[in-house]
Amino acid sequence: MRSLLVAAALLVAPITAFAESAPHEFLDDAKALLVIGACADGTPPEKVKAELVTKHCEKVKAAQEDYKKSWLSVAKPWFEAHVPKTVPKTVVYPFAGGDLSTALTVYPDADEITTLSLEPAGDPRAWSKLDNKQMKTALAVVEKEISSLYRSNFSVTMNMIGAMRGGQLPTQLIFSLTALKIHGYEPTSMRYFKLTKDGDITYLTDDDLAKIDKIKNVAAKNRALSNVEIKFKKSGGKEQTYRHVMANLDDDHIKKDPSALAHLDKKGTVAGMTKAASYLLTFGVFEKMRKYVIGHVEWMVSDSTGLPPKVGEPAGFEYETWGTYTASNMAAGGPVTPQWKELYKAQPKRELAFRFGYPDKKLNGHLIIMKKKK
């Protein structure tokens, strides 16, 4: 009898250990934030005052509709016509801020989209811990940033620092959920994760959350909940995966913490994009990311903050210019302005009816396709 009990205990122990270490599922929080922050159809949770959500959503829905009519309705068919069906289904978007929506516009059929930025996804449970006064203030921040993103088509860096790193609500996450709402997707799973130094994913468990919940500082807690994975689909469609990774992608930070770049390396050949990226990809201190783009990207779309021609062409890329470019819109782009001007001058004029990322110095929209030569 004793041997049977020991055997039974040995069988139960692994099951118990597995249950304790199972990833925590945040889908209910995702659905709550879809209604509260992203203004999807539905009834807010009982804890949240419905009038606050109604007032918040009046402005947010107006911004979303304006975005769909003025930008998405023009940009979406353009990308459908110009993105080859053969591009990799794995997408990497560095310096993305909270911009999942553009990634879904360019690559709607992607199996996996990964964005990287300095901003954390943030605590998805925060909504349940705010009183009405705190919720009103937090929703005002979210509304301001969503309106700015969708009416400017890029986020202002200083705004993101406050709204996404220290926000009472997880603004970066709400941006992502708003993108799903606009494009007609429903989340099917939401988990948070950490990366090992080798770039592997380790999902957060209830034990991890118990430790995180001891953190009182909002910004610090948001940093502890920095990386999110959302699975989503359309009715009758395939399940797709979105991951956001908080990472500083300059060389010094990658040397100290190689996990993000190691994670990207594991993806193999990818499709890429970047825009409104403060020209970071052109800076000397981002050499590792330039090498990553050169070594892994097959097809990429950007504004003038992408990989400059004098770097891309020797590496085997060819470029196709769209819209009008006269000069970069900020001093940081000054060093690469001559390269882009020369490239635009050498190519035929191709009209572009929408803005993609930064405008040029004269507020012209421009877009660049970069692809590996066959």
What do these predicted ranges mean?
Residues 113-164, 188-212:
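Thiol-based oxidoreductase modules, predominantly thioredoxin-like and allied folds used
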Residues 96-107, 153-177:
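Short, thiol/selenol-centered motifs that function as redox-active sites or metal-ligating centers
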Residues 140, 146-148, 169-180:
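Conserved segment of the thioredoxin-like fold in thiol-based oxidoreductases
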Residues 20-150, 219-224, 231-374:
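Non-globular targeting/processing and membrane-anchoring segments
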Residues 1-4:
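Positively charged n-region of N-terminal signal peptides that target proteins for export
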Residues 189-242:
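Short aromatic loop motif centered on NTY/YTY
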Residues 13-17:
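N-terminal signal peptide c-region/cleavage motif recognized by signal peptidases
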Residues 84, 174-186, 234:
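Short, surface-exposed basic-aromatic patches at helix termini and helix-loop junctions that form
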